[in-house]
Every structure is written in C-alpha cells, then in structure tokens.
Design a protein with these regions (language model features):
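Sigma70-family region 2
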Residues: 14-15, 38-41, 52-69, 88-90
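Arg/Lys-rich amphipathic alpha helix in sigma70-family domain 2
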Residues: 62-66, 76-96, 164
Length: 181
C-alpha cells in the first residue's frame, strides 16, 4: 500500500507535473539502478537501461492503477526493460556475426570478505546467459519455468545456466580468497 505522499507524487506525475516526475526518479532511481547494474556489464550500459526503464515507467504509469507496491511494479518493469535490451543486443550481435566474442575479463582486486560491490562485480562478469538467469532466479525470485518463458529457453537450460553461474561464482570467490591470503 502506498503512503499518501507516494500516491500524491504518482498522481502528480500522471498529471505531467515535472516536480513529481523528478521526485519519482529521485526516490526510485537508486533502487532501479541497482537492478540495472545486476543485468548489465558496465555502468554506462546500466545507466542507458535505467533511462529506458524510466521512459517506459512514465509511459506505463497510467496502467499502474495503485494496485500493489509501486516499488515492486517499477522493479518488474525495469527487469523487463533490461531483458529486452539484452535480447536486442544479442540479436544484433548474432546478425553481425560477432556473437562469440570473448567475455570481459580483467583482474579484479580480491578481498577475503566480499562486500556488495565486489559481489556485484563478480555477477557482472558472468557470461550473459548465466548472469541473466542468476539474477532472475536468485535475486528476483522467478521459477525456472517463468525464466524459460521470459527468455524463450527450456526450463532445463535455465537450471543448467543457474548451476553454472553458481559454480563460476564459487570459483571466483575461492580464487579471490586465495589471492587475499
């Protein structure tokens, strides 16, 4: 349920009030940016997805209807924008013949105790398929069946990619811990 202030801000944005729209961005921008960062490889890409998500949010705002949590609604919309961006990017790469480029590497600094920032970096470095499935399952709480439907893959593929993502993350964490010792 929305607080009265939240409802007033949303209603103001629905009326096209610039101040209300800015307040929505300021209030939900950081939370939605965190969602974008989990689905994107770079900060610049996450910022682009966030911008697209807010454009979509303001377009779809009349359909919100004040049913349920606005934060949850905005989060789901942002996840959908991030997935569509990923699928569009993957399609463009396949069409241009560069779909097998090596994944971004790098030598991140290792820490014995991983903080949120370090864990986010590890997740961002996962191959695209692993990263998307990991986020949808482990963070967003979707089932493998739902993930399969969203991404157009088999349920078994979703399970396999999640297992591989977890294994990769465990290996990266162990590697960082060995370096830190």
């Amino acid at each position: 349920m929305q607080s009265m202030q939240e409802r007033e801000i949303i209603e103001g944005a629905l009326r096209g009030e610039e101040r209300a729209s800015r307040l929505l961005f300021e209030r939900y921008g950081p939370m939605l940016m965190a969602v974008c960062q989990r689905y994107c490889r770079t900060q610049a890409e996450a910022e682009d997805v966030l911008q697209d998500a807010f454009i979509r949010l303001f377009e779809k705002l009349p359909k919100y209807g004040f049913q349920g949590s606005f934060a949850g609604w905005a989060r789901r919309l942002t996840v959908n924008v991030a997935l569509k961006t990923y699928q569009r990017k993957r399609y463009q790469m396949e069409q241009s013949g560069i779909d097998n480029l090596p994944e971004r590497g790098g030598s991140p600094t290792a820490y014995a105790d991983l903080g949120e920032k370090e864990l986010l970096e590890l997740v961002q470095n996962l191959p695209d398929g692993y990263r998307i499935v990991f986020n949808l399952y482990a963070i967003e709480g979707y089932s493998h069946k739902e993930i399969g439907e969203m991404l157009g893959i088999q349920e078994a593929s979703s399970r396999s990619q999640l297992l591989k993502a977890r294994k990769t993350l465990q290996q990266q964490i162990q590697h960082r811990q060995r370096i830190a010792i």
